[in-house]
Swiss-Prot record:
Designated name of the protein: Protein GID8 homolog
Gene: GID8
Annotated PANTHER family: RAN BINDING PROTEIN 9-RELATED
Chief place where the protein resides: cytoplasm
Assembly: Interacts with RANBPM.
Entry GO terms, CC: cytoplasm; nucleus
InterPro entries associated with the record: CRA_dom, CTLH/CRA, CTLH_C, LisH, Ubq-SigPath_Reg
Domain of life of the organism encoding this protein: Eukaryota
SMART domains: CRA (SM00757), CTLH (SM00668), LisH (SM00667)
The family this protein is said to belong to: Belongs to the GID8 family.
rRNA-binding as UniProt keyword: no
Pfam family, one: CTLH
Length: 243
């Protein structure tokens, strides 16, 4: 049970005494409680390794494994392959990315039609970005239109994408965000998550979820007490309410 949850439970038991005011918790009291919480170093190391593996920091993961003795949940060699796929999408080399995914595991795209459509859609976007209008139209008709006939959501996405061809100036197009690099990143993240899932690994690192839980717990405790906060998650520094 987290420190915040312990405090919340304790404060709920003292509701009668807190009818008119919040409980004041000094920095000294708070730090004493923090220091009393026992965290295993092995658990912290596992959390760090999970983040490095999921986010694809293979060199950092290898170094951390040597220094801490923490074993990764998957073969680190697969991280390099996964990052190669992600980088290919981020660079607009979608066809290369698809080949790499199939080399890793053909079932990933065979069993995930939505992901495959999004990759093909990204290929179409890249053709439009390069000004290859005829090639883009041919690709849309041969590769994407048949999928749109089978899936209404795919058809709507295809229509939005083809709309990019109507405007000479992409900046005036209602769906210009498809040409943003952020759309490449979105597709790359989707592929990354699918590969992780195929390897029986969480698609998201645990650390961000724990930080969200921290924010939630602080919000819950705010209703019952005044205490030192962690306002900047990047530093983890405790700040008194008066600061």
């Amino acid at each position: 049970m987290s420190l915040f949850r312990i405090f919340i439970n304790q404060l709920e038991e003292d509701d009668e005494d807190m009818a008119t005011s919040k409980k004041m918790i000094t920095r000294e009291e708070w730090e004493k409680k923090l220091n009393a919480v026992k965290l295993r170093k092995e658990d912290m190391n596992t959390l760090v390794m999970n983040f490095l593996v999921t986010e694809g920091y293979v060199e950092a993961a290898e170094k951390f494994q040597r220094e801490s003795g923490t074993k990764p949940e998957i073969d680190l060699a697969t991280i390099t392959d996964r990052m190669a796929v992600k980088k290919a999408v981020q660079n607009g080399n979608v066809e290369d990315a698809i080949e790499k995914v199939n080399d890793l595991n053909p079932e990933i795209l065979d069993t995930n039609p939505e992901l495959f459509f999004h990759l093909q859609q990204q290929r179409l976007i890249e053709l439009i970005r390069q000004g290859k209008t005829e090639e883009a139209l041919e690709f849309a008709q041969e590769e994407l239109a048949p999928r749109g006939e089978e899936n209404q959501a795919f058809l709507e996405e295809l229509e939005k994408t083809v709309a990019l061809l109507v405007f000479d100036d992409a900046s005036t197009c209602p769906v210009k965000e498809l040409l943003d690099l952020s759309h490449r990143l979105k597709t790359a993240s989707e592929v990354n998550a699918a590969i992780l899932t195929s390897q029986s690994h969480e698609k998201d690192p645990k650390l961000p979820s724990l930080l969200k839980m921290l924010i939630w717990a602080q919000t819950q405790l705010d209703e019952k007490a005044v205490y030192p906060h962690i306002n900047d998650l990047s530093t983890g520094k405790l700040e008194d309410p008066s600061e």
